[in-house]
Amino acid sequence: MATPIGNLEDITLRAINTLKSVDIIAAEDTRHTLKLLNHLEIKKKLISYHRHNEEIKSKMLIDILLEGKDIALVSDAGTPAISDPGEEIVKQAIENKIDIIPIPGACALINALIVSGISTAEFSFYGFLPLNKKNRKEKIEEIKKESKTIILYEAPHKLLSTLKDISNALGEETNIVLAKEITKIHEEFIRGRIGDIINKMENVKGEFIIIIDNKQEKNENDNISNQISLDEQYERYKTSGLTKKEIIKKIAKERNVSKNEIYQYFLKK
């Protein structure tokens, strides 16, 4: 069941009625959910259900459901199972032929996407990037191959390093939107080229959604890569009077790779 991301007025009438009618509420953080229940003047039994106890608690909650009781599953904010606990109990409920009823509502990634100005026709959601360096690099390489809008979540203390990793892989000319503290008091949308945004970032606070325009001239760039070599492309721009720095920047953008990658190629020649 979805709950507000930040603005309590985003709770739906159906969600309120559901919270009132169920026997138990399984919450990611019972203290956080208790604040919402107090605001709504609802008193219910709360059971902790988070990432670290998801497997054990799922079995316990399934037993309760099999007794004929109703449970509402909520995360701290937004929709459960979207970068939050919930997937495991849904699987187990299906295996036990227990009815699952979605109670729709706020979802941070969707709300950020629809006001981003970036294509909503096709998109891939990657949640939070892995912490492990190898896994992180592999995931970014996977993103690099996509030709659709990309959506990520990121915490404030890791935002700058994540933006730099994305910039190195996709190019600093890549257009992005940062949705900060969506639906909250300090909601803000930062739009522009990733290189420019990185240079302006300071005193980073709040939760962020990163939306990447990963469809920019993708097909055209792929054709360039397939048709001519880097050396041929370099010579074409050289005859037009561009400097080496300008040529490297232009090739990197057209091939959707980092400037450093192109620079290293010509350095070895």
Language model region names:
Residues A27, P102-G105, L152, L178:
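General beta-strand structural signal in soluble alpha/beta enzymes
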Residues T149, Y153-K269:
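A contiguous loop/helix-start segment that scaffolds small-molecule binding in enzyme catalytic cores
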Residues I5-L8, D76-P80, P156-K158, K215-E217:
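Short glycine-rich anion-binding loops that position phosphate/pyrophosphate groups of nucleotides
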Residues E67-P130:
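Short glycine-cluster motifs
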Residues M1-R51:
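Glycine-rich, flexible N-terminal cofactor/catalytic loop recognition
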